């Protein structure tokens, strides 16, 4: 069985509106795919399914696509849900 850890999730823009919070602490497996982490968040906030294709994670300030990338999380890690970024 994979050990679990507490991580801090930060929500921005539409994801914060849907979740109704700007941040929260949740317990997740330490070893988890990015897509599985997203599913855990959708279970907490089902409306997040609406923005799944519009966001990426930032894990310890590194961008991570919501795919099959394996994450090795540590207690207290910060995972941000980043909305689309436009630049010019």
UniProtKB/Swiss-Prot annotation:
GO CC, any one term: cytosol
Record's comment on post-translational modification: C-terminal thiocarboxylation occurs in 2 steps, it is first acyl-adenylated (-COAMP) via the hesA/moeB/thiF part of MOCS3, then thiocarboxylated (-COSH) via the rhodanese domain of MOCS3.
Modified residues (1-thioglycine): 88
InterPro entries the record matches: Beta-grasp_dom_sf, MOCS2A, MOCS2A_euk, Mopterin_synth/thiamin_S_b, ThiS/MoaD-like
Single GO MF annotation: molybdopterin synthase activity
Additional remark text: This protein is produced by a bicistronic gene which also produces the large subunit (MOCS2B) from an overlapping reading frame.
Subunit (UniProt): Heterotetramer; composed of 2 small (MOCS2A) and 2 large (MOCS2B) subunits.
Protein name as it appears in the record: Molybdopterin synthase sulfur carrier subunit
Provenance organism: Mus musculus
Gene name of this polypeptide: Mocs2
